[in-house]
């Protein structure tokens, strides 16, 4: 394993590219527009500069890490990748298009992985002729800080591919946890319904935003309340994952009407300046 292509230069993709480059791999950072790639590269640059300020990294190490990252706006560049990690938006149609193209472009040995937080790996793998070499790698946000990677086998994922990705995750400084393919996997099957239930608690007038978050912080020792966490994740993302859970697992996972209303209003959390809390632009 020498070269890794990361598709999607946003918050997740940029973070994955950073930890891969820090682990010594050659990285191709890909997105559909040059401005997106440059923005992602700039965030990696800032993250590494912050590490230097904190004494966790030397200036010459930063230069070496950035030197391992190549910018790309063409999927054709995947022809030189040993592993592709797709970190595009959570949309099955887009993932289907990307994986079917990658299947044609990439050499036979290339492993195709997705950072999806909730979509079925088996279904994504079916868009390729190599389902045994398709696997889920669900990183947590922010990627450079969070240790967990959920490694999700599709129905056909081979043991050899799983072992390769497990070893790679360890080399990236992560802790891989094996998870079977089911809606939301483990992380979002547990976390997102908790946020949704907190929204229901607000919707039903049981307590205020601050009160709900304080109960979970002070009573359950959570570092952040569920409504503040929803704002951090993005309420559109929370709703999207709840829709996947609802479709796959039934009415128990129905999204709260208030969550739908906030998303329709454009109140998406921190990224839009308003969610359950207000934020400075």
Which stretches of residues belong to each language-model region?
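Short glycine/serine/threonine-rich phosphate/pyrophosphate-binding segments
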Residues: 13-16, 95, 118-121
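NAD(P)-dependent Rossmann-like dehydrogenase/reductase catalytic/cofactor-binding core
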Residues: 2, 23-25, 163, 170-181, ...
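Rossmann-like NAD(P)-binding element
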Residues: 36, 50-111, 119
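NAD(P)+-binding Rossmann beta1-loop-alpha1 motif at the extreme N-terminus of oxidoreductases
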Residues: 1-50, 54
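Helix N-cap / loop-to-helix initiation motif
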Residues: 33, 58, 158, 207-211
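Rossmann-fold dinucleotide-binding core
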Residues: 111-180, 185-189
């Amino acid at each position: 394993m020498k070269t890794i292509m990361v598709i999607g230069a946003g918050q997740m993709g940029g973070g994955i590219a950073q930890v891969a480059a820090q682990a010594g791999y050659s990285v191709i950072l890909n997105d559909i527009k040059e401005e997106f790639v440059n923005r992602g590269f700039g965030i990696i640059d800032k993250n590494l500069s912050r590490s230097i300020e904190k004494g966790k990294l030397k200036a010459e190490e930063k230069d070496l890490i950035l030197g391992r990252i190549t910018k790309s706006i063409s999927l054709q560049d995947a022809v030189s990748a040993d592993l592709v990690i797709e970190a595009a938006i959570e949309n099955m149609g887009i993932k289907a298009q990307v994986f079917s193209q990658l299947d044609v472009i990439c050499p036979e040995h290339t492993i195709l992985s997705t950072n999806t937080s909730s979509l079925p790996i088996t279904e994504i793998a079916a868009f390729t002729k190599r389902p045994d070499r398709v696997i889920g790698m669900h990183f947590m946000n922010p990627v450079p800080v969070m240790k967990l990677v959920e490694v999700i086998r599709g129905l056909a994922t081979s043991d050899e591919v799983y072992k390769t990705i497990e070893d790679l995750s360890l080399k990236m400084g992560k802790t891989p946890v094996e998870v079977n393919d089911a809606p939301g996997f483990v992380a979002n099957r547990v976390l997102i319904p908790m946020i949704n239930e907190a929204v229901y608690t607000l919707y039903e007038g049981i307590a205020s935003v601050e009160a709900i978050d304080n109960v979970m912080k002070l009573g359950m020792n959570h570092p952040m309340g569920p409504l503040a966490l929803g704002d951090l994740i993005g309420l559109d993302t929370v709703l999207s994952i709840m829709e996947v859970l609802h479709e796959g697992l039934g009415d128990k996972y129905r999204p709260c009407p208030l969550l739908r209303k906030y998303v329709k209003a454009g109140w998406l959390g921190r990224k839009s300046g308003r969610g359950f809390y207000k934020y400075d632009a």
